[in-house]
């Protein structure tokens, strides 16, 4: 993290640099005009992680600044949401004089929501005992006077939830209110306001869709829930069990009745669709009954494996959200053989960094 680069006065310039870089990187695919979705210039991150520095009686948060090649004290953190900055100050004031809570504490993670919840995870290089639980319970009671907070303690092979290990985010997407369970230590989009823009873009890109939707890498159902309105049915896959559980919870609380979640990898699902193997997890699900003309993918940074790319090429329309332009570019070398880009977007999920979130809609040539 380059803390010196995080100057709101430079926000527009850094976004323009990303625009130019992305347009240049994908020029060979002859995409349409790039749609650019900006972030707030400060207080945009809903989660943050800090290491803890113990110096005598003092205790403070720090991050490692790659530009300086040094640890930098962080009493406040400009990218983090206001609720995280407020909690940082309140929490450190309680931890510093409390031996039971600060002893061998090495990291603090914050997960917050636009709707006002915050989850604090305290990570230790020691096993947590009953004294820790008692002190943490008192800490939660004190902080609850100001925050809607839950606290988790973590150590090697140990996790203590004082109440729950998740928050519920509430987003307004095209005037529709959506609720999302977000679990501690699981992936969620860090920039909630840009996430809303991504959802609205995806809804618009698929608004004239016919038939059903197949989604790979669905996570906690972030896009699944929002896109369900545009399709008769949605079949979605995800491998991580906590994410599958959260996705099912989100389907229920949003009263969505046309989504089926399958817990399996994209690679295994590709084998199932090609009828190379049979899977017990697919018992009772008639894959042939789905009329999927559109496929949606939001893969990890490594991109999509060759077999899954072959599966994806079989669909008329491909909606691809990418957190890594390099692997998207590589995947488009294959997908571009059969499909052309009709929508092209940049979402500034990570201001002041080199990371770029992008989206493309591809239609069969």
Swiss-Prot record:
GO terms for biological process: tRNA methylation. Its EC number is 2.1.1.-, 2.1.1.35. The active site is at 323 (nucleophile), 357 (proton acceptor). One of its GO terms (cellular component) is cytosol. S-adenosyl-L-methionine binds at residues 189, 217, 222, 238, 298. It is an enzyme of class 2 (transferase). Dual-specificity methyltransferase that catalyzes the formation of 5-methyluridine at position 54 (m5U54) in all tRNAs, and that of position 341 (m5U341) in tmRNA (transfer-mRNA). This is tRNA/tmRNA (uracil-C(5))-methyltransferase. It comes from Shewanella frigidimarina (strain NCIMB 400).
């Amino acid at each position: 993290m380059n803390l010196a680069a995080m100057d709101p006065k430079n926000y527009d310039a850094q976004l323009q640099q990303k625009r130019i870089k992305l347009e240049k990187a994908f020029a060979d695919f002859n995409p349409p005009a790039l749609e650019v979705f900006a972030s707030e210039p400060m207080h945009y991150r809903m989660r943050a992680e800090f290491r803890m520095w113990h110096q005598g009686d003092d205790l403070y948060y720090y991050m490692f600044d790659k530009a300086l090649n040094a640890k930098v004290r962080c009493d406040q953190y400009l990218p983090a949401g206001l609720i995280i900055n407020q909690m940082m100050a309140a929490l450190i004031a309680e931890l510093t004089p409390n031996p039971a809570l600060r002893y061998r504490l090495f990291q603090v993670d914050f997960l917050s929501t636009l709707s006002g919840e915050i989850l604090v995870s305290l990570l230790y290089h020691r096993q947590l005992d009953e004294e820790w639980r008692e002190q943490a319970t008192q800490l939660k009671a004190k902080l609850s006077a100001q925050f809607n907070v839950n606290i988790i303690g973590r150590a090697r092979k140990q996790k203590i939830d004082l109440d729950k290990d998740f928050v519920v985010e509430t987003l307004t997407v095209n005037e529709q209110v959506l609720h999302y369970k977000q679990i501690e230590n699981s992936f969620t989009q860090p920039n909630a306001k840009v996430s809303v823009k991504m959802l609205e873009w995806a809804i618009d890109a698929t608004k004239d869709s016919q038939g059903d939707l197949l989604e790979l890498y669905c996570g906690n159902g972030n896009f699944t829930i929002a896109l369900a309105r545009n399709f008769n049915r949605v079949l979605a896959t995800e491998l991580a069990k906590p994410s599958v559980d959260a996705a099912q919870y989100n389907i229920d609380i949003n009263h969505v009745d046309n989504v089926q979640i399958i817990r399996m990898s994209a690679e295994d699902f590709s084998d199932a669709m090609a009828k190379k193997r049979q899977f017990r997890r697919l018992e009772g699900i008639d894959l042939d009954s789905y009329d999927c003309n559109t496929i949606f993918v939001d893969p990890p940074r490594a991109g999509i494996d060759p077999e899954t790319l072959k599966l994806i090429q079989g669909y008329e329309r491909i909606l691809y959200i990418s957190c890594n332009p390099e692997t998207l570019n590589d995947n488009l070398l294959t997908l571009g053989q059969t499909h052309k880009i009709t929508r092209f977007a940049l979402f500034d999920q990570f201001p002041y960094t080199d990371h770029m979130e992008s989206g493309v809609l591809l239609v069969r040539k």
